[in-house]
């Protein structure tokens, strides 16, 4: 997306693409004289997300580069484990989340846990991918056993056939070789990766919808993501209406404090007030109406 926008302004902007996952990334950065770096962190596999985060850390903290979105925004993007720690450390309301790196600790926790369902999450994956409802102690114990097994937990690697425009997407997949090769490469990468050695569990918040609040600079947009089946994330079913001002103020206060100016925030309404479920610095808008200015 960055390339598409900048290429249309090549007459006024000098730019170059640097692959932060390539072996010579640092040499290319040092050889140039750049005013700004536009980051596009990967969100498909943990292996490349970790590599990207580490190199962006060097770029920002050791070389003093100016980057947008910021390092802070990239670190909490597509990293549910890190996000849970960050939210808790900053006393930001969110569903209670437990991360276990010790199998016995996780099993003991479930043996004493009374409230179900409980949510199991894969560390990386958008649109509700990798989210599993554990409806009983038996299901939760089995989930933990798989988390610490040699196979581990796997996210959905194949296309989501429940999403809309299936025929259009299949035609594009069939006719567009470049797109097909790209998608197959992504599917293989997800298939070959598994999460093992730790487990992420989260309290279930009853809901019929999530709020999606987007901040871009000083502009704010919001709509409801309606629930389809068990989840609102990834349903692509939206409801438009005037969002509560206290919801926008809630997001503004948090993003102002932490200087997060490119954010999509998914929020539950609960008896404890607003709870942040996800925060993403890279996001899309499927409907131009979502950007309507009031």
Stretch-by-stretch model annotation:
Residues 2-108:
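Conserved N-proximal alpha/beta basic substrate-recognition cap immediately N-terminal to
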Residues 84-144:
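Hydrophobic alpha-helical segments and helix pairs
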Residues 92, 208, 260-262, 271-274:
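Coil-to-beta-strand transition motifs
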Residues 118, 200, 221-222, 263, ...:
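Protein kinase-like catalytic core scaffold
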Residues 119, 268-269:
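Conserved protein-kinase catalytic-loop segment immediately C-terminal to the catalytic Asp
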Residues 135-250:
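Phosphate-binding site of ATP-dependent enzymes
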Residues 238-242, 257, 269-294:
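C-terminal active-site "lid" helix and adjoining low-complexity regulatory extension at the edge
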């Amino acid at each position: 997306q960055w390339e598409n926008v900048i290429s249309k302004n090549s007459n006024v902007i000098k730019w170059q693409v640097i692959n932060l996952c390539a072996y010579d990334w640092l040499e290319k950065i040092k050889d140039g004289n750049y005013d700004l770096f536009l980051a596009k962190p990967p969100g498909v596999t943990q292996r490349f997300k970790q590599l990207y985060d580490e190199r962006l850390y060097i770029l920002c903290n050791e070389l003093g580069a100016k980057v947008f979105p910021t390092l802070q925004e990239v670190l909490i993007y597509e990293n549910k484990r890190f996000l849970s720690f960050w939210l808790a450390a900053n006393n930001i309301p969110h569903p209670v989340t437990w991360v276990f790196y010790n199998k016995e600790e996780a099993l003991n926790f479930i043996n004493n846990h009374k409230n179900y369902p409980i949510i199991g999450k894969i560390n990386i994956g958008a649109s509700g991918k990798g989210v599993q409802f554990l409806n009983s102690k038996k299901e939760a114990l089995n989930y933990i056993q798989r988390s610490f097994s040699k196979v581990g937990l796997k996210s959905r690697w194949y296309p989501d056939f429940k999403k809309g425009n299936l025929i259009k997407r299949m035609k594009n997949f069939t006719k567009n070789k470049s797109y097909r090769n790209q998608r197959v490469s992504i599917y293989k990468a997800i298939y070959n990766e598994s999460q093992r050695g730790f487990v992420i569990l989260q309290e279930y918040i009853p809901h019929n919808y999530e709020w999606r609040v987007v901040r871009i600079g000083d502009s704010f947009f919001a709509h409801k993501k309606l629930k389809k089946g068990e989840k609102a994330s990834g349903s692509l079913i939206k409801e438009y209406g005037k969002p509560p001002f206290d919801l926008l103020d809630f997001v503004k206060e948090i993003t102002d404090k932490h200087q997060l100016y490119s954010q999509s925030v998914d929020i539950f309404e609960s008896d404890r007030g607003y709870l942040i479920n996800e925060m993403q610095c890279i996001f899309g808008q499927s409907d131009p109406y979502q950007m309507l200015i009031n």
